[in-house]
Amino acid sequence: MPFKSDREYRNLAEGFTPQEEGKVVTGYATTFDQPYKLYSDGAYEVWEVVDRNAFNQTDMSDVIMQYDHEGRVFARTKNNTLSLRSDEHGLLINADLGGTEIGRQLYEEIQGGYTDKMSFGFTVRGDEWKDETIDGVQRSTRTIKDIGKLYDVSAVSIPANDSTSISVRSLTDGVIERLKAERLERERVEALEQRKAALRERINNGRTDED
């Protein structure tokens, strides 16, 4: 599956569902205000959440539906065979696959359960980060506030795990390194303060290391 370095990719929050009328499939590209985990190693976690207003200014003028993010186009917004709209739950996708033979074949694969996973490619124009410690685990949560452009939604044969995909790793690696550096600095400062406190106690008790 080819990934373009200037885009981010995520598995769809919920798989596509074939509709009984026509060759139409529907599903949610993402859900709003529902954090999901991108990375965890027991000591550090990276979470992400999409703000419900993230798509308000998104360029969705020519979004296409593909297979594995490459090759033939099965549906697209420009010819009204692909539509996307935000509702209370998330970004809803509706794709009419009846226009071409390969589209109808993909519909049959989705209907038969042979292909049931999807992912989408996008760019982020604005986000915010929040760091906190929960039960001894350092967590950094990214809130996506503004998605700049949505490029494609794709049926995928073997979906990349969000925690190991290239686009997610490029995001989380830097966050984990920062969290580790901040933890080391806190531990260094805490150790220094403990040594200072111990020295003050010895001085207050009239003793020094030379006693």
Task: Give the ranges of each region predicted by the language model.
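Signature of dsDNA virion morphogenesis modules
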Residues: M1-K180
